[in-house]
Amino acid sequence: PTIKQAQTDMTPKYEDLRAYYTKPSFEFEKQFGFMLKPWTTVRFMNVIPNRFIYKIALVGKDEKKYKDGPYDNIDVFIVLEDNKYQLKKYSVGGITKTNSKKVNHKVELSITKKDNQGMISRDVSEYMITKEEISLKELDFKLRKQLIEKHNLYGNMGSGTIVIKMKNGGKYTFELHKKLQEHRMADVIDGTNIDNIEVN
């Protein structure tokens, strides 16, 4: 299968995806995470880099993983979400352990596209992983942002998949026609065990 190119006039669904995946993202290393008393159905962790307070919604696996805290030596990958919980600065998932050593792990990124005439093109490049532990949120967001900037994702193509293939034979798939599900934003994988990444 190859990425199918969408019509020039994007549907509102793709406009929303383009708007989300071109938002600014923030990365903070070696943080302390403080737990907040629950006031809604979702619990939150506070991180306070640079005197700003960011609240991170604990969803999916994070809900059981983070109990009372505080937690030190955590990295956070933050994309500010719409104001769903009466909060101005909140993000979902993206919490990982700080590296114990330097990581420079290069993997092959292969992009296969099919244009309106049915011509198939393939682009192969290197993608650098710098984390021992990386969240699906960070991988999904950075890869889609790169696809938007370099390959006009959501401009002339709107469907397809990103597949993260692991050395042990496992794989993780992101479907390009929808935003990554919130519970998966908390999923964390071994960055050094990524074998290659395919987009098609």
Region locations from a protein language model:
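Sec-dependent signal peptide cleavage junction
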Residues: 1-14
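Residue-identity detector for glutamine
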Residues: 5-7, 31, 86, 117, ...
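A structural detector for beta-sheet-dominated domains
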Residues: 57-59, 79, 163-167, 175-179, ...
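Short, exposed beta-strand-loop hairpins at the edges of beta-sheets
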Residues: 174-192, 196-200
